[in-house]
């Protein structure tokens, strides 16, 4: 179905967003209600967990939405290690503990509860303890002060820390996790956080592996008390359809939203950034007056534009392949040779590729996670090998299997 064009289209009230945090008043978004409800169950049960997903997979947006979702019943302290903790703060326990405490205080003050006298009094006691101990304020003292604060206020505290990848290769951060573990185990004796939620690309076991390559400590992570976070954060075709229905309504557009949603999902497998970027490109074509923007032909054009552009996600993917050459070799084998590799997260390359969002489990076999990534990796490797005419010629002949006129493999 070709969308009807009108000369007096409504100005779009919202936009598709691919940078920063999404919020429903400014951006077209999928409905997160069910997902937030599932995460809340973990929080209500007092679980600590890690949201580790690939780059631009909606982690930060999820944390912000979750903070608002929990705010009626919990005091949510939201921190960001990338913004609040520089590398210098990880020099030793004292510098880390002081910096963490100050960041914690700042995040506490901007909460709604932080403006009440009762909460301000409890926070003031925490701050005074930090200042009084000074150079001797280390992790033990930090957690003792946190425990006192937790006991002094009515609401239970949920601590969220985004961008924990910036703590990679810092022993003091692992010691911080060990303190969290100790208080979690002894929570019946000492007041502590209701729940601790960490977010980043790497999981804590991978941080541990990079810190301590020796076998004795390889799998002995202080985060082994964490619950599994297996909530699907990708977008389903149904969720994409509901988002497109909002868009069509606001833009007075007749779009076959179900069909377009299925095609977008077919190319992206619901990878949040890729979904939003394709929609963004389609909207740009539509607003510029292109006939058939929100159609099959429009999607083919948007895909071609997307895989040829430079963006932060693709730049990060190229860097990862360079940093992990064996992973690049495996991707080549899958793309060019059709090599079958059993999916087993105990295999380091499979685990790393899955963590980066490059790979997925498809009926027990390793596959590249979506068609956009297939096309992009294919183009990357062909460009790298262009000097080898045999590789280039063979690859060029295969190109049609990825984007044909029908849009299918």
PLM feature spans:
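P-loop NTPase nucleotide-binding core
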Residues: 41, 45-57, 61-176, 194, ...
């Amino acid at each position: 179905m070709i969308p009807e064009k009108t000369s007096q289209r409504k100005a779009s009230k919202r936009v598709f967003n691919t940078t920063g945090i999404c919020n429903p008043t400014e951006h077209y978004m999928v409905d997160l209600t069910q997902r937030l409800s599932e995460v809340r169950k973990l929080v209500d049960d007092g679980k600590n967990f890690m949201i580790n997903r690939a780059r631009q997979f909606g982690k930060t947006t999820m944390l912000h939405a979750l903070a608002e979702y929990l705010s009626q019943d919990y005091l949510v302290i939201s921190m960001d290690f990338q913004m609040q903790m520089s590398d210098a703060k990880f020099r030793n326990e004292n510098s880390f503990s002081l910096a963490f405490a100050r960041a914690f205080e700042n995040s506490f003050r901007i909460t709604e509860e932080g403006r009440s006298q009762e909460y301000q009094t409890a926070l003031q006691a925490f701050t005074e303890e930090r200042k009084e101990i000074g150079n001797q304020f280390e992790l033990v003292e930090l957690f003792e002060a946190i425990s006192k604060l937790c006991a002094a206020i009515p609401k239970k505290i949920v601590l969220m820390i985004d961008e924990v990848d910036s703590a990679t290769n810092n022993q003091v951060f692992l010691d911080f996790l060990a303190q969290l573990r100790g208080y979690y185990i002894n929570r019946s004796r000492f007041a502590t956080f209701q729940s601790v939620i960490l977010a980043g690309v790497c999981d804590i076991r991978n941080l541990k592996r990079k810190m301590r390559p020796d076998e004795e400590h390889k799998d002995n992570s202080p985060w082994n008390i964490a619950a599994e976070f297996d909530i699907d954060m990708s977008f389903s075709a149904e969720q994409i359809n509901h988002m497109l229905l909002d868009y069509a309504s606001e833009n007075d557009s007749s779009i076959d939203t179900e069909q377009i949603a299925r095609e977008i999902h077919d190319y992206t497998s619901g990878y949040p950034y890729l979904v939003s970027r394709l929609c963004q490109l389609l909207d740009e074509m539509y607003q510029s007056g292109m006939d058939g923007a929100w159609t099959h032909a429009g999607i083919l054009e948007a895909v071609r534009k997307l895989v040829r552009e430079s963006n932060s996600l693709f730049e990060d993917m190229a860097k990862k392949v360079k940093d992990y050459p064996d992973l690049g070799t495996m991707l080549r084998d899958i793309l060019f040779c059709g090599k079958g590799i059993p999916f087993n997260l105990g295999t380091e390359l499979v685990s790393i590729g899955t963590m980066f969002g490059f790979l997925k489990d498809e009926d027990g076999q390793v596959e590249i996670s979506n068609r956009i990534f297939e096309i992009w990796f294919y183009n990357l490797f062909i460009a790298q090998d262009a000097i080898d005419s045999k590789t280039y010629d063979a690859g060029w002949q295969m190109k049609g299997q990825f984007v044909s006129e029908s849009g299918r493999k």
